[in-house]
């Protein structure tokens, strides 16, 4: 996955997250949508991690295409 594809995914997920937050603020969030919001947050963490891996590999003179998404349970515990 290219940097551009990852950024596109991040943007898409962020837009979906914002829409769900607007619904939540209006008191219109169904339980399934609340669950989706949780999944989006985890997927965003994973996508940002992959983008950071690619940048680190590139900066080290290595092939960024060797970066792979890490398991969600690994990236969700990272400190911001």
Residue ranges and their predicted role:
Residues 1-80:
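Extended, charge-rich alpha-helical interface modules
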């Amino acid at each position: 996955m290219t940097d551009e594809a990852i950024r596109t995914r991040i943007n898409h997920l962020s837009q979906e997250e914002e829409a769900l937050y607007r619904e939540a603020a209006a008191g219109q969030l169904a339980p399934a949508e609340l669950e989706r919001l949780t999944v989006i947050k985890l997927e965003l963490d994973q996508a940002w991690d992959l983008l950071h891996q690619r940048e680190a590999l590139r900066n080290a003179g290595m092939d960024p295409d060797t970066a792979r998404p890490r398991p969600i349970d690994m990236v969700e515990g990272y400190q911001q």
